């Protein structure tokens, strides 16, 4: 098999670090950092620096950080769209996240995931990949960590 046809096992791993936060006054924020796609075309800009695609925050809806194949996240303005569904259609954050990731993104054969939070403390994550590293720190100092698409998270008490 020619080398060009062999796919690296790491070809679909993303190196994105995302964060969403809620302060005690109900203000929310999001941040996204990425190393980008391996062997990308010169001049390619991914979704992370594009507000509304890979990162978005509005105290009227939600704060969101996303990771995945950037071209699809840009095309769908994934971050803004999830928050718009919460603000204008009244969907819960989890419903909005799942609709965009599992319906809209998958219909374009895009892959990735997101984390998001609302000013009232709803927290959601959604992904259509085998796993997505994620963690949650509660107000009481309880740390929850997850990798795969299961409901059980590792619970750690922070001191």
Predicted regions mapped to residue ranges:
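N-terminal nucleophile
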Residues: 1-153
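Conserved small/polar residues in nucleotide/adenosyl-binding loops
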Residues: 154-159
């Amino acid at each position: 098999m020619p080398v060009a046809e062999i796919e690296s096992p790491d070809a679909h791993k993303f190196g994105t670090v995302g964060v969403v936060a809620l302060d005690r006054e109900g203000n929310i924020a999001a941040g996204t950092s990425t190393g980008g796609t391996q062997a990308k075309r010169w001049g390619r800009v991914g979704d992370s620096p594009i507000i509304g695609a890979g990162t978005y925050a509005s105290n009227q809806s939600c704060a969101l950080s996303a990771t995945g194949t950037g071209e699809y996240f840009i095309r769908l303005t994934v971050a803004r769209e999830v928050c718009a569904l919460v603000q204008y259609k009244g969907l819960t954050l989890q419903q909005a996240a799942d609709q965009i990731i599992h319906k809209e993104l998958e219909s374009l054969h895009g892959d990735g995931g997101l984390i998001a939070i609302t000013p009232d403390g709803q927290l959601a994550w959604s992904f259509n990949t085998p796993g997505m590293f994620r963690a949650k720190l509660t107000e009481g100092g309880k740390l929850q960590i997850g990798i795969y698409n299961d409901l059980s998270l590792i619970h750690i008490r922070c001191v």
